[in-house]
A protein has these predicted regions:
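A Rossmann-like FAD-binding core segment of flavoenzymes
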Residues: 2-49, 61-78, 100-180
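Conserved catalytic-core motifs of eukaryotic protein kinase domains, centered on the activation segment
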Residues: 50-54
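Flexible, Lys/Arg-rich cytosolic regulatory linkers and terminal tails that connect or flank
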Residues: 56-58
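N-terminal Rossmann-fold NAD(P) dinucleotide-binding loop
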Residues: 91
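Beta1/beta-strand and adjacent pyrophosphate-binding region of the FAD-binding site
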Residues: 78-88
């Protein structure tokens, strides 16, 4: 990320972090200072649920929420085994952060193949280098709990069907399920 920021700085981009537009400064004030273009990077505000039974169990975290808690100095109780659902850059950030927080076995569970992953190749390679294991063509169907806490994850084996509107082959369930 720092290398990407440096490239932008070299291009003349000026960063103003921690500024509340509308409170600390207004767009009109910035215009008066000669600025002509603005990019407001507010970030993702909330994790999206995956929509399977068991999401309410203790030990289930949304990716954005998990990263926010860690960035604020928190230590989420993730245990020694961690499954991260998804194949994007946030999922890569979450799995690598989980490893750094002490998870000994960290898995990416992704419903398509590696070729269809939206994450940057560099992010995937770095996650692999940090010991993250990948389980492709798997989709979560249930988060299993014991005494109100996560104990396992039930996944369904997927196959790739016809391409979707973005050109990625659509995952299709096979009814073959296993517990990981």
């Amino acid at each position: 990320v720092n290398a990407e920021i440096d490239v932008l700085r070299e291009m003349g981009v000026e960063f103003k972090c921690g500024v509340k537009v509308g409170k600390d400064i207004t767009l009109d004030e910035l215009r008066a200072q000669g600025y002509k273009g603005f990019y407001l990077a507010i970030g993702a505000q909330k994790s999206a649920p995956i929509g399977v039974p068991g999401e309410e169990l203790e030990g289930v975290f949304g990716g954005i929420d998990f990263l926010r808690e860690v960035n604020l100095g928190g230590k989420p109780a993730i245990g020694t085994k961690c499954a991260v659902i998804g194949g994007g850059n946030v999922a890569m950030d979450v799995c690598r952060t989980a490893v750094r927080c002490g998870a000994e076995d960290t898995y990416i569970i992704y419903r398509r193949s590696q070729a269809e992953m939206p994450a940057d190749e560099e992010e995937i390679s770095e996650a692999m280098a940090e010991g993250v294991k990948f389980r492709f063509l798997s989709a979560p169907v249930e988060i299993i709990g014991k005494d109100g806490k996560v104990s396992a994850l039930k996944v369904e084996r997927m196959e790739l069907g016809e391409p979707d509107e973005k050109g990625r082959r659509k995952p299709v369930g096979t009814d073959r399920k296993s517990v990981v």
